[in-house]
Amino acid sequence: MARVEITVNGAKHAREVEDRTLLANFLRDELGLTGTHIGCDTSQCGCCTVQVNGRAVKSCSMLAAQADGADVLTIEAMAKDGVLHPIQQAFTECHGLQCGFCTPGMIMAVAGLLKDNPNPTEEEIYHGLEGNLCRCTGYINIVKAVKRSAELLRGKAR
Amino acid sequence: MYQFSYVKAKSLKEAGEFLAAHPDAKLLAGGMTLIPTLKARLAQPSHLVDIGGLPELAGIELMDGKLAIGAATRHFEVAGSDTVKKAIPALAYLADLIGDPQVRNLGTIGGSVANNDPAADYPAAVLGLGASVITTQREIAADDYFQGMFATALDPREVIVRIVFPLPKRAAYAKFPHPASGYAMAGVFIAETAQGVRVAVTGAGPGVFRWQEAEAALATNMSAAALDGLAVSAEDLNEDIHATREYRANLVAVMARRAAAKIAEK
C-alpha cells in the first residue's frame, strides 16, 4: 500500500491506497469527484484530464503515488460560488458539447492550452486538443467554444 | 493492472541498487508508455522505481558547444525551451509533435530513448544528430545505441542520465503522424553535421535506421530534388493494419524530401 497526500482543489487529502491506484480512480473512488470521467482504457480519450501542478495530464495514465505531494485541479474547482468559469461559460454559449461525456476533460485541456497560448489560431486549437476525443464528433462547436473561451479570458484579464 | 510495489527513488544510485536487487523491477519516469502497457496487462513488473522527479536527471543546458538534456526532461519542456529553440530548432519542433499535450506534459526524453519504440520521434533526432546517450555507466554513441525494435545497448541496471546533442549546421524533421495515436507512420530527421549529412528514419522499419543513399545524395546537394528517384527498400519495413510496407516506403521518400526542402530554406 502507498500512503499519498494530494492537494485536490485546494484541500489536502491523505489516503492509504494500493500502489497501482490510478489518479483517476483516486479522484473518483476515494474522493467522490466523479466529474473526472473515464472514457477509455487505453489513454486515448482525454476525458479524465485534470491539472497536476498546473499542467494538463490524463489522470488515467498517472499513478496516485506519482501525484503524492502534488497540487491537482479537477473540473469541480472550475465554477466558483455558482458562477461558471469562463471556459464553461463559453462551452455553454457555443453549445460545445453533444452528449457531454468528454466535456470535463475538454475543459481541463482547454484550460491548459490557453494558459500556454492565450490566443490560439484554429490550427493551434486542433493541435492543442489532440489528446481529447469527442465520440459525438462535436468538434466544430468545441473549437468555437475554445475561441470564445480565449476571448472571455482575455477580457477578464484586462 | 497486476499488482506491483511503487518505490520513489531518492537518488540515481539508489535506483541502480534497487534494480540490481530486484531483477523484475522497472524504471518509471513519465509513464506515458509504461502505464498504458501495465493497464493492458502486457507487463508484470514486481516494482516500479520512480525516477521522474530526480534532480540529477533534470535540466537543459549548452555545454562545450553541445546541447545536454537531462533524461527526465518532459517533452513540453524541450518543445518550449528557448535554449533548444536557439541551438537545435528542429529538436524543439520534433518534441512538440510527440503524442498530444497531455503526453508531452509527462513523457520524458530518457523514457522515449530507453523504450526505443520503432515509431517514436526522439530516436530519429538522437540518431540523426549523432548524439550520445550518457548513462550511469558510460557514454554510448547513437550509432551503437539503437538495436532494433524496443532493443537498445542498455544493460538492465543501466539508467540514462542525459542525452548530449552536438549542434548541427542545419537540421529538419518531417513526420507523417498516425492520425489517432500521433506516432510516426514515417518520420525523417536530416542533419548537416560536422561529420557530414545524416538521415535517420523512424516509424517505417522495425527500429530507427540511417538511410545512407539519401545521406550521400544530400551531401553534394541539400535539396528535395537530390532525392528524386531514391527509395528505401520496402522489403524490410513494417506492415500492419495502418499501412502496407510499400506505402511506408513511399512515405519515407516523401518525408525525406520535405525535411530536405525545409533545410534548404534555412
Set out the residue ranges of the language-model regions:
Chain B
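C-terminal structural segment of proteins
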Residues: M1-K266
